C-alpha cells in the first residue's frame, strides 16, 4: 500500500522552552497555548534551561534541572521534555527539528532575530509568540519567591516540614 502525506492530518511538533522552576498556573497555560499553535494532534516538546544557564541569565534555580524535567514531563500538554544544551541553544532545535517554536508572552526573545539565526543555521521552522497570558496573583516564579520571603513562619508552621 502506498503512503502519502496529507498536510491536513500531518502532526506538527511544537517546541516550547523555559526554566519551569517553581511550576505555577502560568506555566500550564503557556504550555496549553503553545501546543494549540500546532493545530489538532500537535506534539509538544518542552526544552528546559540547564541550571548553569539559569544561573548565568536569571538567578540560582530553586529546583534542580533533573527534578524540573521530571515535573514538566508530568504536565498534561507535554508529550516529551528534554534538558537544553549548556553551550548552544540551537543544538536541540537541530536535533528535534520542530515545525514551530513557541515563545512565551514574557520571554525576552526578539522573534525576527531568532528567525534570522535559525535560517542562518539552516533550520526551517516557524517562530510564534503565545499572545495570551492568564494573570493571577502568583503567575511567575519571582512572585512566588517574593511572597515566601515576606511571610513570617513560626516554629509550629515549620515543624512538619
UniProtKB/Swiss-Prot annotation:
What is a biological process (GO) this protein takes part in? FAD biosynthetic process
Enumerate the SUPFAM superfamilies for this protein: Nucleotidylyl transferase
- Family of this protein: Belongs to the archaeal FAD synthase family.
Summary of subunit composition and partner proteins: Homodimer.
What keywords is this UniProt entry annotated with?
A: ATP-binding, FAD, Flavoprotein, FMN, Nucleotide-binding, Nucleotidyltransferase, Transferase
Gene name in the database record: ribL
Give the protein's recorded name: FAD synthase
Q: Supply the source organism for this entry.
A: Methanothermobacter marburgensis (strain ATCC BAA-927 / DSM 2133 / JCM 14651 / NBRC 100331 / OCM 82 / Marburg) (Methanobacterium thermoautotrophicum)
The keyword Nucleotide-binding appears for this protein: yes
Amino acid at each position: 500500500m502506498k503512503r502519502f502525506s496529507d498536510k491536513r492530518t500531518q502532526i506538527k511538533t511544537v517546541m516550547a522552552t523555559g526554566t519551569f522552576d517553581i511550576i505555577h498556573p502560568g506555566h500550564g497555560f503557556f504550555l496549553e497555548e503553545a501546543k494549540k499553535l500546532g493545530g489538532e494532534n500537535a506534539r509538544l516538546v518542552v526544552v528546559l534551561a540547564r541550571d548553569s544557564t539559569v544561573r548565568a541569565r536569571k538567578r540560582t534555580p530553586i529546583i534542580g534541572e533533573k527534578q524540573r524535567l521530571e515535573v514538566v514531563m508530568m504536565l498534561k500538554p507535554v508529550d516529551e521534555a528534554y534538558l537544553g544544551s549548556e553551550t548552544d541553544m540551537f543544538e536541540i532545535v537541530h536535533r528535534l527539528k520542530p515545525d514551530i517554536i513557541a515563545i512565551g508572552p514574557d520571554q525576552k526573545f526578539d522573534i525576527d532575530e531568532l528567525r534570522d539565526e535559525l535560517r542562518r543555521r539552516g533550520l526551517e521552522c516557524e517562530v510564534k509568540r503565545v499572545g495570551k497570558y492568564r494573570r493571577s496573583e502568583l503567575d511567575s516564579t519571582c512572585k512566588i519567591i517574593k511572597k515566601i520571603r515576606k511571610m513570617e513562619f513560626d516554629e509550629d508552621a515549620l515543624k512538619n516540614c
